[in-house]
Amino acid sequence: MEEAAALWLAHEKQFFVAYVAGITPINVCYIVRKIKGADVAREAVDLLISTLHVCVIDQQVLQAALAIPMTDYEDAVQVAAAVKLQLDAVVTRNTKDYANATIPVFSPADFLKQLPTT
């Protein structure tokens, strides 16, 4: 969680522009609701979508993801969404599943190392 907090702070300092895939708020809601309840889950989603940009998941992205030779379709969708918006990279704790991604992929720690320190 320290890396997530560091990424959030770096985004607040405008060291980078942060995007999440359209599926991310849904996943956050599901996980937080199970742990903390529906009200906290809605607050978490509201904070996420009001603070970060959201990559739209449309038919073009879903089709493009099928052409990416990745095992996990959801991961491929995230890559396709990032590519469609011409983003520079994907940041994920699960870098091993992104070996065939068509865009650079960084772990949170590796991405943080590339950012300014002030």
Summary of predicted features, one role per range:
Residues 6, 51, 83-118:
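Acidic, PIN/NYN-like endoribonuclease modules and their adjacent C-terminal/linker elements
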Residues 32, 69, 102:
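Short, flexible helix/strand-to-coil boundary loops that buttress conserved ligand/catalytic motifs
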Residues 45-51:
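Extended, non-globular alpha-helical segments
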Residues 1-20, 33-40, 100, 112, ...:
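Short, well-structured N-terminal submotif of metal-dependent ribonuclease cores
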Residues 5-9, 45, 78-79:
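Short amphipathic alpha-helical segments and helix-helix/interface helices
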Residues 53-95:
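Active-site neighborhoods of divalent-metal-dependent phosphate/nucleic-acid chemistry enzymes
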